Amino acid sequence: MRQFFTVVFGTVVGIFAFFFVLIALFMIIGAVGGAMSSMKAKDSYVLSLDLRQGLRDHSAGATVFGSTPSSVVDTARALNRAKDDDLIKGLFIRANQFGMAPASSEEIRWAIKDFKSSGKFVITHAQGFEGTSILPYRAVSASDELWMQDTTGFAVAGLRSESEFYGGVFEKFDAKPQMEQFYEYKNAANTYTQTGFTEAHREAATSYLTSLYDGAVEQIAEDRGISTDAVESILMSAPHSAEAALDAKMVDKMGHVEEAREYARKKAGGDSIKFKTVKAYGPGNNYSGKTIA
């Protein structure tokens, strides 16, 4: 019996000793990790933002497969936070040459301008602006220096929209869409009742696109320090070579992405400068600043 209690007591003591050692080990690891984090916190960084991956309007949380998608709002908040962070020296952007939503394009532009207001630089590199609309270009036009690969071209175009019409389809199945439509410019129902654009629908769509286009041209002209006529002239006469885009002040330098990246590193302070993605930097608890997306 005595041997039994001795074994039980020894087991209990052993368990407590094990957990004590385990807790102490975690505390040591935490202390070392904190010290390393403190050391890393002294590093200086250039933030990097890859707009080619596309951005959601708002963060949608983690996906089943892959990482959490970046969002326009989190990106804007992160840049607003970074402008007052002394460890962040600048921003390096990979431009989107495919397409971008109007609100996202304008929000990123304002976020870049807000970041620059602290005196920090923004360097953007584009592999080319070929076959894309004016919106991805407008997003980065406020960069301090806009680089483009010299082997590509500049063919930023205007805007267009497409609508599908199912008028007459339902009738083939002895069905009839019943919708209330108030005035001719309330055109949501036209998708199901018309076979093409009505005059009012076409006017509304054209007016909307013209407003977006004119606004983008004005902002680009402001950012590039040229007239709106000059911007429209190069857009209307596209495509252009990289050299022609440089002469027209639509880009500032020609070079490959590695050259632009190293240029940003040197501008920030040299080889000791590290790069950190805007997503990894994160918005923190910063809810200041205006967002429109």
Regions found by a protein language model. Give the residues of each.
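Extracellular glycan-binding segments that recognize GlcNAc-based cell-wall polysaccharides
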Residues: 256-258
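Short helix-initiation/N-cap motifs at beta->coil->alpha
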Residues: 234-240
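Small-residue-centered hinge/linker elements
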Residues: 1-228, 239, 261, 265-293
